[in-house]
Amino acid sequence: MKKILFCIWFTCILCQAYSQSCSFPWENGPLQVSENSRYLQHTNGTPFFWLGDTGWLLPERLNRDEAEYYLEQCKQAGFNVVQVQTINGVPAMNFYGQSSMPDGFDFSNINRPGIYGYWDHMDFIIDAAARRGIYIGMVCIWGGLVKSGKMNVEEAKAYGTFLANRYKDRPNIIWMIGGDIYGNIKTEVWNMLANTIKSIDKSHLMTFHPFGRTLSAEWFNDAPWLDFNMFQSGHRRYGQSKDDKKTLLPQGTEEDNWRYAEHSLAQRPLRPVIDGEPSYEAIPQGLHDPKEGFWKDNDVRRYAYWSVFAGSFGHTYGHSSIMQFLKPGVNPAYGATKLWYEALKDPGFNQMQYLKKLILAFPFFERVADQSCIAGDNGTKYERLIATRGNDYMLVYNYTGRPMQIDLNKIHGKTKKAWWYSPRNAELSYIGEFSSKVETFQPEGGHLNGNDWVLILTDGPRKYVEALQ
């Protein structure tokens, strides 16, 4: 415990120096949807690759020093978005014993002189994130609270007015309506909340966080307040859905999160899409029963690369201990045993940055998902290969290290250079130069789950991989 306290203190010193010397992403302008409606960018055209961590209970469970430490570790690991539950109760209570709603949905006297209130702490967290170039994805209120009647339409209008006026001028806000709920439950409340915020805050993007194995486009693709779609591929493994007819995909495809991206990008109007809640590292398969086994770092890598290569504009990672901020004195959920600050050392948390590094090394807006790059069998379940390409580059994700036949004619250039890229440590190894035809590739390590690699192919003269070296 003494070690973690020292780290928190040292982090606070570092962040002061960092905030004085760093350039921030919003200096490129606010976020907006790209011209091709597939990605996010800043208003000056700079690409934005969303790499999110799930910090659901950050506002409720961490004190100021702990919040600073956590956000610094997120920055160091390459995350540029943290998703939080703005309130997880009506009212919610934070580390300091302060209520989010001392007067219910009347926020006229929320700023009480001499009291470091709930929203003062929220301000602190948002500003601490901003000092590190991190956006806060604010789930305004968790869906179960609305479902149980804790906020009606008029209260949603009052709450949305309060939130929008308080945070419209912060540069690092992304609004998230919903919160693990079907969009056809209390739809009138969600529309009121979203439209109220948007009527006041016209600068920040907005989405809807849906229930597991569903997609926001099912209910809101035509909604004027929705800027991009989000799906929750959820925490179940193949065969665990039990014929749930409310889910978007059929039983037996539960882990195929790439299918949600494909489905969303086929909708019109076309909107960018992201997996806002895939299986978390160290959470039980199926979510609730530890006896079912736990998801590991290789699993969270698979979800990330499958989704992004299938067309998602970014990805959100999660860890069971981190999202609930498990620490001494807190009752664990979902079979968690590791403390949150120890979980920051886990491999999945630290490997996500290699995906962002990879995608940003290549021309961003021309990238498309293209399974025709695979000349052989696409594969099913864990054997599924996922290909994405630009005009003169191609990336193919292979989760099992199996042989694969790739059509090099799908990108420009008479000759192609090839590399293996490791999602585990970002190591790059040159394979060789090839003519434009179908070639067979297989990485080292054998054919087994978790021996995952990205095959990189470029037009011979291109120097894109220099950014990865």
What are these regions (language model features)?
Residues 223-238, 242-326:
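Catalytic-core region of carbohydrate-active enzymes that cleave or remodel glycosidic bonds
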